[in-house]
């Protein structure tokens, strides 16, 4: 796809990068077939190809309006289109650039600005998020439905973590929302890894991965959080930590992008590249281990929801399922498993109606095989699916750790 950049855009390094990405697109339209928002809305501008045209028009100096912003905002960034694209278009990078340029040219309505700023001030701060969640649980009957639905109906308390006692050690990103919404997930991870001879090291100075800010178009703040994490992890990396582990695939997908996002930062480019190379999802670590040592015989019938950030962003589709099958669990078939559940980070709060439709469609698919429980690999998906109030939804490692206790 050829573009005629304006003089302003020719002076913009990110616009030049966008132009380079656009050149790979042959506007074949394969991407529209797997786009969740296009399937729901049937509007070309709510599919990847249409959004690519909108970004092209922005780069060429056409008028940028709230409608332009609305169509770009409606994208889930699920990256299903990237899995489908035969030309290898880096759509998510293009979208980030397009959104950033549009954000500078269009002033959002006040309610949108308040919501987005509120999310940015709360979600990345675990203590604030925990306190407000506790208040929300008390006030649940009086809250709007879309907020009420996001509060956990139940949480499993974190079990004790084992001491640092093994030579093999990994860092683990604790996350922002997960310690409050699913506090046992990281503890269960540490306990399973301990049985395999791997200790999880704390990195207390590390914080939010940066995805919340970045995807709400506060991209510089997102990059600042990335730099903070690199600094927090670096001493442990130099001391020989073999991996940086993520139990939330949304965080993992973003940390794996640090190298790309900071490639032009003279101070952080090399460190960011090394961090991205060390970043692994939990399943990447476990699949290489002798799981038979755990002596688990899974006795549950599960439906696994593979998050978009795991299957499309990290290209790990089918890997959790293989691990669960190795451990003896029974898995049901899930129709249209490539489609997004509608969580998409903060999307379920910024676009509640679309998110709810996608959630209900996904729950119908997950429940079609009549599982005892639904398991997933990302806290956003877990919370969003659970908000339907139907089949119980947990992180898959918790179910593995439960089975471990029975042995």
Swiss-Prot record:
Keyword Cell membrane appears in the UniProt entry:
yes
Family matches, as InterPro entries: 4Fe4S_Fe-S-bd, 4Fe4S_Fe_S_CS, Cys_rich_dom, Glc_ox_4Fe-4S, Helical_ferredxn
Gene Ontology BP term (one): glycolate catabolic process
Supply the PROSITE patterns for this chain: 4FE4S_FER_1 (PS00198), 4FE4S_FER_2 (PS51379)
Q: What happens when the gene is disrupted?
A: Abolishes glycolate oxidase activity. Is unable to grow on glycolate as the sole source of carbon, in contrast to wild type.
Q: Which Pfam families match?
A: CCG, Fer4_8
Protein's cellular compartments: Cell inner membrane
Task: Report the induction information.
Answer: Part of the glcDEFGB operon, which is induced by growth on glycolate, under the positive control of GlcC. Also induced by growth on acetate. Expression of the glc operon is strongly dependent on the integration host factor (IHF) and is repressed by the global respiratory regulator ArcA-P.
Highest taxon of source = Bacteria
Q: Which GO terms describe its cellular component?
A: plasma membrane
Cofactor binding note: Binds 2 [4Fe-4S] clusters.
EC number(s) recorded for this UniProt protein: 1.1.99.14
The protein's annotated catalytic reaction(s) are: glycolate + A = glyoxylate + AH2; (R)-lactate + A = pyruvate + AH2
Q: Which UniProt keywords apply?
A: 4Fe-4S, Cell inner membrane, Cell membrane, Electron transport, Iron, Iron-sulfur, Membrane, Metal-binding, Oxidoreductase, Repeat, Transport
Regarding activators and inhibitors, the annotation says: In vitro the glycolate oxidase activity is inhibited by the sulfhydryl inhibitors CuSO4 and PCMB, by KCN, but not by the metal complexing agent EDTA.
Predominant cellular place of this UniProt entry's protein: membrane
Name any one GO molecular function: glycolate dehydrogenase activity
Q: What does this protein do?
A: Component of a complex that catalyzes the oxidation of glycolate to glyoxylate. Is required for E.coli to grow on glycolate as a sole source of carbon. Is also able to oxidize D-lactate ((R)-lactate) with a similar rate. Does not link directly to O(2), and 2,6-dichloroindophenol (DCIP) and phenazine methosulfate (PMS) can act as artificial electron acceptors in vitro, but the physiological molecule that functions as a primary electron acceptor during glycolate oxidation is unknown.
Q: How does it assemble?
A: The glycolate oxidase likely consists of three subunits, GlcD, GlcE and GlcF.
Q: What is this protein called?
A: Glycolate oxidase iron-sulfur subunit
Q: Which organism is it from?
A: Escherichia coli (strain K12)
